[in-house]
Amino acid sequence: ASFAEAPPGNPKAGEKIFKTKCAQCHTVEKGAGHKQGPNLNGLFGRQSGTTAGYSYSAANKNMAVIWEESTLYDYLLNPXKYIPGTKMVFPGLXKPQERADLIAYLKESTA
């Protein structure tokens, strides 16, 4: 199912998901720097593999996807299938509600 069919996202629920499943490797605050994964500040509208100062896989750079709700929704279902060769080891979020919640949180927290 596509993002157009996704349930409405709850940013508060998304923040909990981020803290338990994403924050070990990612930051969202401007100027927070990179961890194992890149800082996600300014994520929406940015091309994959282009965050300054982070060493991306060739797969992530070559995919050249623009991160928006619809691309993140598909990516977060199964990152390794969406971008084969990505360094992101996260297996994905199978539940549409969890993906919608996380995207709602990321829209607020990375702007």
From Swiss-Prot:
Subcellular location: Mitochondrion intermembrane space
Keyword Phosphoprotein found: no
Gene Ontology molecular functions: electron transfer activity; heme binding; metal ion binding
Classification via SUPFAM superfamilies: Cytochrome c
Residues involved in heme c binding: C22, C25, H26, M88
Heme is among the record's keywords: yes
Sites of N-acetylalanine modification: A1
Keyword entries, A-Z: Acetylation, Electron transport, Heme, Iron, Metal-binding, Mitochondrion, Respiratory chain, Transport
Top-rank lineage group of the source organism: Eukaryota
Family statement drawn from the similarity comment of this UniProt entry: Belongs to the cytochrome c family.
Name the record gives this protein: Cytochrome c
Native source organism of the sequence: Arum maculatum (Cuckoo-pint)
